[in-house]
A protein has these predicted regions:
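Bacterial Sec-dependent N-terminal signal peptides
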Residues: 1-27
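Short, intrinsically disordered/low-complexity patches at protein termini
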Residues: 3, 14-16, 463, 568-570, ...
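Hydrophobic alpha-helical segments, especially transmembrane helices
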Residues: 3, 8, 53, 542, ...
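Acidic/polar surface patches and capping/hinge elements
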Residues: 25-645
Length: 739
């Protein structure tokens, strides 16, 4: 290990028995967290489900610790979470508190992990490991009592697990039915990826992919070759700290989609090229252009040290700002790097590597697998290795006395787990509602249509790709490629990663970059995976990573990794799994947690599975989630504070329905469905500037029959907020008025 740096590994390809050393070195919470990550790596690749698993296991450990603390308060025991109340009468503390905490944590985790992973495809590895850890810690699995009233720590742990299991069976995840979707249906026919072309029905909506064989991101062979959308209804799951004021409930086909932190409609491709079509084309064209950066032989060298990259400034908000922020031709974004390592007081040493090595390592490093703990688990691994660094001090927010390793771990996991769960609920709620297209579908669709730059050229289509010299062009008679003849003349060709057909052996060959037909474009992924089986907007990586970066920054009180830099070494011709490479040792380096997050975001563009339109909203929303989850979670560390649980939760959980929404500016009536016992409710219509425009007081019969938003004058199209108040409770609903 270099002095002043941190090496951490995300455990790709980790083998059974990996924590032998940690048994002697780490807290009991850390041991069980490592067991959870092992279980996730051996399970199906489900970021939503595993963010929830990490949240629930973190709550189990935190409450088992807090139950014996004189200062902290529990999160779950004795509290109401969503519609679930966990009864708790307290436990005597007149005995060995450290031992009781370890015992309660271990029993809670043992029961919960066995429940969650008993049906896992890797159960033959996971369950024996959990058993061996439990026995190694000195506990008896035959003790199943949950009667903790006499002071049994084991019984308390069993009770916590029992209650969390019951909570999970009613939290909106549909765990009881293996998390199956209950109403979502795709609008597009599947794309058979091995054949060129794409004539999908709606270029703005997600398209299933049909593969010869589907291998998920954890390396599991799935017996269906057209995977279903993962968790499109996840916005309905009970969150950690999300607020009703940030919630919009949309309706499609009489089904509700709960969306927190609504980013608004992404760019849409219109038949005539109007509206936001140009933004759509630019976004997906950029993904194709960046695919040209995946060849280490192109002669382009980059300094990938923290002095050369990182320290990204203000994120773009408008389409014009996007075009300034992202560098379409050369790749990367506007960033200044860090001139000095604050830990050493010296400049960061340059690291010059081929751009094509950096981009490929980046894409695979942050990928979800195989043998991955998924993006939410990545940030637990990062948190664990930050805690292990010799320069790290276990001071909460960087202040006060050092905490014990157990207290540091349970508090870290509690806030990080809650934040990752909120990120999953938010990102997948947005994915389900907007149902946005992935690059492989969009690029092949536009490439099949033609080009939109010059209506005097052949193959013109308002829905085609925009030409970029040297990167997106049309096939000419002088082209000598084998496919550049006959019916291919005039079609759109792109300079891009050539795809899996050019990789006969991933261990010894790589595809490189060259001219291919746009209708046959591939993302930098395995042909057995191609793209994640869920919609694009918003990027889960961007959301999870920015959320995690904000939490670790606040938790440690320092934006920088311990020692001023985190590192990961990708060995020459060993690290890459999609194809041979890298051509030299590449050291991934980050000065700050946010730098790591930003690189995670960009990795998805070079990997060909997200455009900028997915990335930036994910970063912005992730920052909001991370900060809010931290502020919410830290309140539980003191009995003198009153955690501000969503005061609107009673209304929220009644699934208030406002329809039609969006509403036409010519529509007179809007209706609400609120299963409430309040005899009279107050309604206030507020604009985006916070001005109160209308106020009504109505009983149930009135608002269910419908009332006009336009009383007192016609409202202009835009976003408004309907604040509902009754008996001291409030709920705010977003209402969109359109032409």
């Amino acid at each position: 290990m270099r002095q002043g740096t941190l090496h951490f590994f995300l455990f790709f390809g980790l083998i059974f028995g990996f924590t032998t050393l940690s048994l002697a070195q780490h807290s009991v919470a850390r041991k069980w967290n490592e067991a959870t990550l092992l279980a996730i790596r051996n399970d199906f690749a489900r970021p939503t489900v595993h963010a929830r698993n990490l949240f629930h296991t973190s709550v189990a450990m935190y409450d088992a610790w807090a139950a014996y603390d004189l200062t902290a308060q529990t999160f779950f025991l004795g509290k109401k979470i969503g519609n679930f109340t966990c009864n708790y009468i307290g436990i005597p503390t007149n005995f060995n508190v450290p031992a009781a905490r370890e015992e309660a944590i271990s029993y809670a985790m043992y029961r919960l992990l066995n429940h969650r992973f008993k049906g896992s495809p890797g159960a033959s590895k996971t369950l024996p490991y959990i058993d061996s850890l439990f026995v190694a810690l000195g506990y008896d699995g035959s003790f199943t009592s949950s009667n903790y009233s006499a002071g049994s720590a084991a019984a308390l742990g069993n009770y916590i697990a029992q209650q969390l299991i019951a909570f999970g069976l009613q939290d909106g995840s549909n765990e009881r039915n293996s998390y199956a979707n209950t109403f979502y249906q795709p609008v597009n026919s599947p794309l058979v990826t091995k054949f060129a072309g794409n004539n999908m029905e709606n270029p703005n909506r997600w398209q299933p992919l049909s593969l010869d064989v589907f291998i998920d991101q954890s390396g599991n062979v799935i017996p269906i070759n057209t995977p279903l959308f993962l968790s499109p209804e996840w916005g309905n799951v009970t969150p950690f700290s999300l607020k009703s004021q940030d919630l919009t409930i949309f309706t499609r086909d009489n089904n509700q989609y709960w969306v927190y932190h609504d980013p608004g409609t992404p760019p849409q491709l219109s038949p005539d090229g109007s509206g936001t079509s140009a933004a759509y084309q630019w976004n997906f064209d950029l993904v194709s252009c960046w695919s040209a950066h995946l060849d280490p032989r192109d002669g382009v060298m980059w300094d990938i040290s923290p002095g050369g990259i990182g320290n990204t400034g203000t994120l773009p908000k408008t389409f014009e700002e996007y075009k300034d922020f992202y560098k379409v031709v050369q790749g990367g974004v506007t960033q200044t790097g860090h001139p000095i390592n604050p830990s050493t007081g010296k400049p960061y040493a340059p690291q010059m590597v081929p751009r094509g090595d950096y981009t490929r390592v980046l894409a695979e490093f942050w990928a979800d697998g195989p043998s991955s703990e998924t993006p939410p688990g990545h940030w637990f691994s990062i948190a664990n290795y930050v805690a292990d660094h010799p320069a790290h001090q276990r001071k909460f927010k960087g202040q006060g006395e050092e905490l014990t390793s157990l207290e540091w771990d349970v508090k870290t996991y509690f806030i990080l787990g809650g934040a990752m769960h909120d990120a999953a609920v938010t990102a997948w709620g947005i994915k389900g509602w907007y149902d946005y297209v992935r690059p492989v579908s969009a690029i092949r669709y536009m490439g099949t249509k033609g080009q939109s730059s010059d209506n005097k050229l052949s193959h013109f289509s308002a829905q085609g790709m925009q030409l970029v010299p040297g990167l997106i062009e049309t096939v000419q008679p002088a082209d000598t490629l084998s496919w550049a003849k006959g019916g291919d003349l005039g079609k759109v060709k792109v300079r891009a990663w050539r795809g899996p057909n050019y990789i006969p052996n991933p261990a010894t060959t790589y595809a490189g970059v060259g001219w291919i037909l746009a209708e046959g474009w591939w993302p930098y992924q395995r042909p057995t995976f191609v793209s994640p089986p869920f919609a694009g907007l918003i990027s889960g990586h961007s959301t999870f990573s920015r959320t995690g970066a904000e939490v670790l920054t606040m938790l440690t009180g320092d934006a920088y990794f311990p020692g001023g830099m985190g590192e990961f070494v990708a060995k020459k011709n060993e690290y890459l799994k999609f194809e041979e490479g890298p051509s030299m040792d590449v050291i991934m380096q980050w000065a700050t947690y946010r730098d790591a997050s930003d690189q995670s975001s960009l990795s998805r563009i070079w990997g060909g599975i997200h455009p900028p339109a997915d990335d930036i909203p994910g970063r912005m929303i992730g920052e909001k989630i991370g900060k809010a989850a931290f502020a919410f979670g830290e309140q539980y560390f003191s009995k003198t504070s009153t955690p501000t649980r969503d005061g609107l939760s009673d209304f929220q959980n009644m699934a208030v329905k406002v329809y039609p929404n969006p509403i036409s500016s010519s529509t007179n009536q809007i209706k609400l469905e609120i299963p409430t016992t309040h005899p009279v409710l107050q309604f206030e219509l507020i604009n985006q500037q916070g001005a109160k425009l209308r106020t009504w007081k109505m009983d149930v019969d009135q608002f269910q029959a419908g009332f006009s938003l336009h009383e007192g004058g016609r409202l202009t199209p835009g976003v408004y907020y309907l604040r509902i108040t009754g008996d001291g409770e409030q709920l705010t609903k977003k209402v969109v008025i359109v032409e």
